[in-house]
Amino acid sequence: MFGRDSTNRTFPENGLNGPWHGTSHHNDNPVNVKNYAIMNRYHVRLLSDFAKQLRDTPDGDGNLLDHSLTYMGSNMGNSHRHKHENVPVILVGRASGRLETGRYVQYPLGKERTSNLLLSILDKFGIHREFIGDSTGNLEI
């Protein structure tokens, strides 16, 4: 699923009434930064719940979490400044053994393009492309 980062949808489930997009432009105000973090934690908690459902669903010699890959990310590292560096991404699942789990990876500045990660994911699944969008090459994933 792709979601619109510019949505003005509110998420009362997380205890806040402010819109997603407006809150992302926090202007470095500590209260707004805190509220944006609360919104992000809520979404990560939903991802965690989804991963648990995948883990608890048998599939062949393992479970759906073993045999799938779920990508959660943002299109910006600092949404207030519209910066595309240090974009947070979470990969969940082993992709049928193609990925090692339980790691935190930070790529050097300039190498961390989301398109490089997407290119690398395709490569892990045997889909070899020279580039995707503005990619400059594969990453170690």
Feature locations, PLM:
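Ligand-binding pockets and gating/stacking loops
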Residues: M1-I141
